[in-house]
Amino acid sequence: MSAPPIGSFEDAVAFALTLPDTELSTSYGKPAVKVKSNGRAFLYTGHEHHSSFGIAIDLDTIEILKETDPDTFFQTPHYEGWPAVLIRFDSADPERVREMIERSRDWTAAMKPPKARKRK
């Protein structure tokens, strides 16, 4: 039986929250799922929030995703060169999308917590 499609940001969040050490939070004032133990966001609304969501992942993986499934995985100029890729809702391969959300969580969980920002 194949996985149901991820048709909305809420579907992506619901799946991400089934992963270990995750919590619903915000990033840049918008909803996001973070790794609890280090406070880093790995899934977020992104700038194309009506048609996609974003995940944090390494640059090499992003290039492979864009080459092998450009209908699902893409970057706008805002994200190019950064470890972030956008994922269109209702992908033809929802299992791969879930796998990438899991990999994003694992990749982000391996990072140290961000340094505190100075308040102005």
Language-model features, listed with the residues they occupy:
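Charge-dense, helix-prone N-terminal extensions
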Residues: 1-120
